[in-house]
Amino acid sequence: MKKYIPDLLALFRIFSAPVILYLLLLDGTDEGLMLVPAIIAFIAAWTDFFDGRLARKWDVSSKMGAFLDTIADKIFITFIFVGFTYIERVSVWITVFLIAREFIITGLRGLAGNEGISIPPSKFGKAKASLQFWAVGFVMVDFQLTILSFTIADLIVLHALIFSYISGYQYISGYLKQTR
């Protein structure tokens, strides 16, 4: 059973994303209703922290687990940022650029894999994932703690976008170096 726990944590992120989106669409402007999706998002963010660590600690890493972890992050961030855009907490252009980057790099990694090329995650890529989860938290917390300035969430979202494109550039340049 222990060998499935990391995969189940990634699956939790995948299945929590549409639930959070639904709750945001239900009434994402109601501060009281934001508590439930905020708690679910917080738990989901921690699953991202633990799934890989547990897989390595218990020596149950697998290709399926690595795939699920990567896809879970992309599904989670895509769903949540679409919801944030719908409730007008994040600009459309930020969501479009984040999602575009995710599709481009996922496609590139698939292409590289088909060619037998491995592009390991960079420090910027790992920081990007952390910043995206922090951004989700801060956007939601701004609804709960009105003493916080909205600019804190906006700055973290912007940093997540910047790190997304820096890590995207690293993936593309890593691929190009290996194909020349």
Feature-to-residue mapping (PLM):
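Alpha-helical transmembrane bundles and membrane-interface segments of multipass inner-membrane proteins
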Residues: 1-180
